[in-house]
Amino acid sequence: MEITTQEQYQTTMWKGGTTRQIFISPADGDLAARRFDLRISSAIIELTESDFSDFTGFTRYILPLEGEITLLKDGRRIPLSHNELYRFEGDEAVSSENTKGAIDFNIIVRHGIDVEVGIVQDECFSDSRKTVVFALEDISIDGELIGKHDTATLAKPFCLKGKAVIARFSE
């Protein structure tokens, strides 16, 4: 199991704030060139309004970690829940209204890639698919502690204690 703390995440600036890349597959993937299958990130949003970038050919998932985020899509206002990933297609025109300094969690998956994503709590997994576990609170995996907003990556059966977002896939 590989543990990555939030201080180790690759950080970049964007027009609306700061993004921390948590995971990308393949490892040499390139966000700007859209050359990746799966990318997991978290953004600190400094603007109170922002537009989502076009990711045609990808499916997106978003979860607010801190603050409030409301999506504007097809003339509708969609307040996001802190307990449920919201799914939308990367080619949809989506903007958001946020509390200043809101923090979100994002998963972007290329169409055709089989990825299981979800929020789990106190679960065991019996297969060896590659799994990225993002801790929504202090958690443990097979007894090893993982801090809030840190990540564990593993490819073996495991038991999780606590609440986390998972992305499970075959490489």
Name these PLM-found stretches.
Residues 1-171:
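Jelly-roll (double-stranded beta-helix
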